[in-house]
Amino acid sequence: MSKKVLIYGATGGIGTATAKKLAARGNRLHLVGRHADRLEALASDLNATFSCGDILSEGFIPQTVRDAGECIDGLVYAIGSITLKGLSRLTHADFIRDYEVNAVSAALAIQAALPALKKSPHAAVVLFSSIAASQGFGMHASIAMAKGALSSLTLSLAAELAPTIRVNAIAPSLTQTPLSQSLWQNETMAQSIAGLHPISRLGSSEDMAGLAAFLLSDEATWITGQIMGVDGGRSTLRVKG
Ligand SMILES: NC(=O)c1ccc[n+]([C@@H]2O[C@H](COP(=O)([O-])OP(=O)(O)OC[C@H]3O[C@@H](n4cnc5c(N)ncnc54)[C@H](OP(=O)(O)O)[C@@H]3O)[C@@H](O)[C@H]2O)c1
């Protein structure tokens, strides 16, 4: 059945791949992004509507929900930031910005969309956490904290909104998108990080989009409150002893 899906971060790597997959399956999309030219081009390709702005701008989140329409079946929050610094270099502003962009704005987006999500017979929300929320990585203190909060938000809202709205999160390991480019643009470094995964490669946006589309679909109507690793086995397996 065709669903109306609101996608935040639609011009990002994972957001775009998710939008393309959902559109190919006949869903109707409302896209949210910061860059008018890229957003307009994607919306035109996918026959979607869109809202352009910064998620932290006053009044922008309620505006995106008004623009999306009265009934929303799916919400994807694929906005994210990454601040990789040692603790002594992290500023108060770094912590607050990562927390607001990754966690608080996700909560506010779901809050604003609640009346529209409640009008859907099978509403579902997909958030993006990170492997760094459950595994300790150096230089990740700020983003790990923010994604840890997002994982907890997933559980809390899944409980609060059941059985009307399902809430799940995907926790990627290193995925080749613009966000993480500094970690994979050097071939030697990319291969070395790929080798840390039991399935020895880096993630792709399509790996994430496949699970996001499944979690939004009617094939997943008994799945809620889950934080699912898409990480080549890195968070759970030790294959080399
Ligand atoms: N890539 C990875 O290795 C990785 C690992 C773990 C978790 N994740 C999570 O996966 C999700 C998708 O990220 P991605 O890898 O696809 O990264 P991406 O390509 O950089 O996409 C992130 C999107 O967030 C948008 N964004 C950032 N700050 C914003 C703001 N203040 N207002 C509005 N939009 C904003 C960016 O907009 P612009 O296009 O305008 O910059 C971009 O579209 C994020 O939640 C990220 O934290 C990614």
Positions of the model-derived regions?
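Conserved glycine-rich cofactor-binding loop
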Residues: 11-12
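Alpha-helical segment proximal to the catalytic Tyr-Lys
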Residues: 115, 158-163
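Residue(s) in the substrate-gating loop at a strand-loop-helix junction
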Residues: 130
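C-terminal helical subdomain
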Residues: 169, 188-219, 223, 230-232
